[in-house]
Amino acid sequence: MRWWDIEPVMGLELELFPEDSWSHGMYWSELAEAHPGGTRHYTVATTGDGTVVGYAGLMAVAGEGDVQTIAVAGRHQGTGLGAALLVDLIREAARRDCTELLLEVRVDNPRAQRLYERYGFQPVGIRRGYYQPANVDALVMRLDHPSTEPKDIEDLHHG
């Protein structure tokens, strides 16, 4: 993700997460750390004409990774794009020597929970009232020892 992606990402952000969307400033702050040696990794998915249809971000510090965000435009959900973005984050976490990768997902989003489970994430806790202002709980999930090896990821996906 580059600075010029922030506007189209914000369009998706507001569409997909109207109650608890990130601000422009939050994305600018995240991108400020997305450089060689930085603590962030962000990626966007685009169509052939350059339209942003998905994005994802990772924070990696001291061997721990955290999925900051992952989103796919509604019309592209169910196409494997979310899985591709997740695999990118898993591989990046492994490249950064993370021994675990954490994420939060809304408890009322079973589709996303199933995606994460297919790639080896396990539930480890609940954060009460995490998503505001709707006061929705977050399920905390963890993947131990993320891998850069495609076969490992494929084994998780098909196993």
Region locations from a protein language model:
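Acetyl-CoA-dependent GNAT
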Residues: 3-4, 8-79, 86-96, 144-148, ...
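Conserved phosphate-binding and hydrolysis motifs of nucleotide-dependent enzymes
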Residues: 54, 80-82, 109, 120-121
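Short glycine/proline-centered loop/turn elements that form peptide/ligand docking sites
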Residues: 86, 108-112, 129-134
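Conserved GNAT acetyl-CoA-binding A-motif
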Residues: 93-104, 127
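Structural motif
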Residues: 96, 114, 118-119
